[in-house]
Amino acid sequence: MKFLVSSDDTGVVKEVICNRGTDTSKQDATQPISVKNFCTEPNCSRKNRIIHMINYQEKYLVAIRIGGELSVYEIADDEYEIEDEYKYNLLHNYKLEVSSSDKPISLFTVDILEAVAVAFSSGKVFFVNFNDDKFDKEPVLVQLPGGKEIAEFSKNPSVEGIFGYGGEENDVRIVKLYESDITSEIFDTENVENNFKSEVVFTAKNVKNDHLDLRVPVWITKIRFFTEQPEKGYKFITATHYGQIRVYDTNHGRRPVRDFTVCQKPILTLTFANEEESEVIISDSHNLIAKHSLIQVDDKASKTHSASAGDIIKPVAKLLGRFVDQFGATYGVEVGEGLLVTGGLDRYLRVFDLASREIVAKVYVGVEVSSVVVLDYEEEESQEEIVGDVELLKKSEKRKRTLPVVEREESDEEDLWNQLEEKDIKRKKS
């Protein structure tokens, strides 16, 4: 397995190569094959550390740094063995026009534009097209309406041009930034910014006052759109600074159709746990990583007593289990191939089995982690196995030299077929 983790302490990226069963906290356990530093340019330090990274089309590692630097690094083809000095070379570094205090809050791919979108807490959103490796197009700036700071900006994966955002005392807004029939060709036009707009198509309404008739504070931290969207309107889920997850269907009004309190700390990450999107994984600012069902609800799970209102019973999204072992907040979360990959303040990269919640791999990386990227879930060949293969090859070559010419040719042909069969088996497995 191969992972990339951002280093908050130094601003670089660490590449971690390990197999199942790896555990650096135990001396007698399997150790990682490799843990190395990369992406040391441009002048990396804690001051310009990476906040978010993504794997762009298996070609680039794209990272947004504090201060507005968008760094694009090359992801080399795994089929070829490459020296470390040629790995993750810096291809281009964009300097986005933001203030030093303007924090990057999201980074993701926009396939229809062959671009990435970067959002900042000020409400500035930049669309960056790499123009077939030329990197000669200027980023396009779109300012989100509202005039308030935002803590989250997310795209609707099923409806082009639709995005959601929100923040502290800034409830969810769904906005249309471009038409659905747009293409990457707009970046070749003179006034490319004219192809973008900021049309608010939905504004959420706060939940009803609490049992004391007090207003419930608003602080959106995460938004995730469901893949299956209604014909009209939008369906999405939010997480809040106050430990709530809320499900919205805009066809049923501006308020959430479901409102659950799942923890007492700010929710930092919100990720769908399965293809059906019926389960979510959250992490909070303390040490919680938990999986909840969105369809199984414990109607009487939350019970509080009020002197004025008596017993107050609220439904809670059923807790399906917790992923334990971490200490401190978890910021980097990725789900895929039946695995959960995490990284955070306790300086460990962990890989969990989604079904059993058992630790599959645990690697101490020595740095605080803000973002995690998975490059490969497949098992890697260890150095010992490589050395063993080389020794076996040497013995085979030595044996061939002692054979007559005809037998040697037959042996070479047999080896060739064996190699082809091996590759075919590997392809089928993957």
Swiss-Prot record:
Gene Ontology biological-process annotations: ribosomal large subunit biogenesis; rRNA processing
SUPFAM superfamilies found in the cross-reference section: WD40 repeat-like
Signal peptide per UniProt: none
Cellular compartments annotated: Nucleus, Nucleolus
Gene Ontology cellular component annotations, sorted alphabetically: nucleolus; preribosome, large subunit precursor
Keywords: Nucleus, Ribosome biogenesis, rRNA processing
Role: Involved in the biogenesis of the 60S ribosomal subunit.
Family, as annotated: Belongs to the NSA1 family.
Subunit structure: Component of the pre-66S ribosomal particle.
Record-given protein name: Ribosome biogenesis protein NSA1
Source organism: Scheffersomyces stipitis (strain ATCC 58785 / CBS 6054 / NBRC 10063 / NRRL Y-11545) (Yeast)
